[in-house]
Amino acid sequence: MNRKPGLHPRNRHHSRYDFDALTESCPALGAFVRPSPAGEPTIDFADPQAVKTLNQALLAHFYGVREWDIPDGFLCPPVPGRADYIHHLADLLAEGNGGALPAQASVLDIGVGANCIYPLIGQHEYGWRFTGTDTSDEAIRSASAIIDANPGLNRAIRLRRQKSPGAIFNGIIHKNESYDATLCNPPFHDSADAAEAGNARKRRNLGLAADSGLNFGGQQQELWCEGGEVGFITQMIAESKLFARQVLWFTTLVSKGDNLPLLYRALEQAGAVKVVKKEMAQGQKQSRFIAWSFLDTAQRERWAQNRLR
């Protein structure tokens, strides 16, 4: 088996896509499969409908999600990379749980999106319970439709709309709630122009015309915010301090490694007791997430004994 370099050992996507098996799970994919120049089956990754149908097939084949769709223009996430975040998060929780992967974790997904991808993967792989949040009504409606269309998911995944676009945890984490972890794929760009420039680069890399549609889509709240990635995560760090005793691990993806020093400084100023960086890779693409806790070692161990075992 040709393993994709860098993926987590438990990631289900190490080998090349088996298009025969995927098409059996999702017959609609067959219309998009074509031979590559080397004669291997593939799809046109510049075709948004082909990419979306591939995701439908991957979710059906590997994660038991029989009904999945997103509205046009919303982010269509690469499933292997999203799964990696979940698996590395499981390892982080296991480190404080005697090495045992937790089956009882409760996770808060900031920016669940129309695709609901992290809850779908995390619930299937580990049986975790999720609360997904988003500022977009349309994203919440789409995620809710996915949950309702797949039996059993409504017992494991609940959704909350963030009614204050400038807030992250405020208004979402209730007074008597606790979460074992939060996760987030934050907006990367700091303006609409920067987001469009990024999409233009993506189109050039795919050999697309300048006026062609986006490959993976993305709404404003998914792609950019004032202050960009650093601004968003810095606010997240500041708000996390308000919920220091209600969350074991706060985590977020960090797309740009150069942003880490600023974020570490913000974490120090916020009084984070423990900060961890988890490196991830998918082929040539490098990524990472940072995690922080306001609980000391003894408090984290007690938390795990009470909630994760």
UniProtKB/Swiss-Prot annotation:
SUPFAM superfamilies: S-adenosyl-L-methionine-dependent methyltransferases. InterPro entries: METTL16/RlmF (IPR010286), rRNA_lsu_MeTfrase_F (IPR016909), SAM-dependent_MTases_sf (IPR029063). Keywords: Cytoplasm, Methyltransferase, rRNA processing, S-adenosyl-L-methionine, Transferase. The keyword Magnesium does not apply. It catalyses: adenosine(1618) in 23S rRNA + S-adenosyl-L-methionine = N(6)-methyladenosine(1618) in 23S rRNA + S-adenosyl-L-homocysteine + H(+). Its main location: cytoplasm. GO terms for biological process: rRNA base methylation. It is found in: Cytoplasm. Its EC number is 2.1.1.181. One of its GO terms (molecular function) is 23S rRNA (adenine(1618)-N(6))-methyltransferase activity. GO terms for cellular component: cytoplasm. Specifically methylates the adenine in position 1618 of 23S rRNA. Belongs to the methyltransferase superfamily. METTL16/RlmF family. This is Ribosomal RNA large subunit methyltransferase F.
